[in-house]
Amino acid sequence: MDLIQQLEQEEIARLAKNIPDFAPGDTVVVNVNVVEGTRKRAQAYEGVVISRRNRGLNSNFIVRKISSGEGVERTFQLYSPLIASIEVKRRGDVRRAKLYYLRERSGKSARIKEKLPQRRVAAKQAAE
């Protein structure tokens, strides 16, 4: 590990952000700190994660939502101080790492199936 990677790892450890495990296809709520004049408040942004880029301190993800019938995408830096919290609403069942094809789709064709817990694991836990 070179010096830059080591410094990035130390910075990530120092930030100690509580980031949940999420993947493309998941519906998330990102609370962003917004400064308006002298006031600071948290603004919620809910949508589907269409991309995730894991690059250490430079990791980011793109969230897409439909606002007033128009598709809106926003890129968030994972370790940004502007992000107050990330909450996973539902898990999506997708087979791609980048869901850019959702940009051309609208309505029912843009929906993503929900990933349900595995039956075998649930049955095994119920038997115990």
From Swiss-Prot:
SUPFAM superfamilies, per database record: Translation proteins SH3-like domain (SSF50104)
This protein's UniProt keywords: Ribonucleoprotein, Ribosomal protein
NADP recorded as keyword: no
Keyword presence, Ribosomal protein: yes
Gene Ontology annotations for the cellular component aspect, listed alphabetically: cytosolic large ribosomal subunit
Any GO BP annotation: translation
Molecular function in Gene Ontology: structural constituent of ribosome
InterPro entries, sorted: Ribosomal_bL19, Ribosomal_bL19_CS, Ribosomal_bL19_sf, Translation_prot_SH3-like_sf
Gene3D superfamilies listed in its UniProt record: 2.30.30.790
NCBIfam families: rplS_bact
Family the UniProt entry places it in: Belongs to the bacterial ribosomal protein bL19 family.
Reported function: This protein is located at the 30S-50S ribosomal subunit interface and may play a role in the structure and function of the aminoacyl-tRNA binding site.
Record's protein name: Large ribosomal subunit protein bL19
Gene that encodes it: rplS
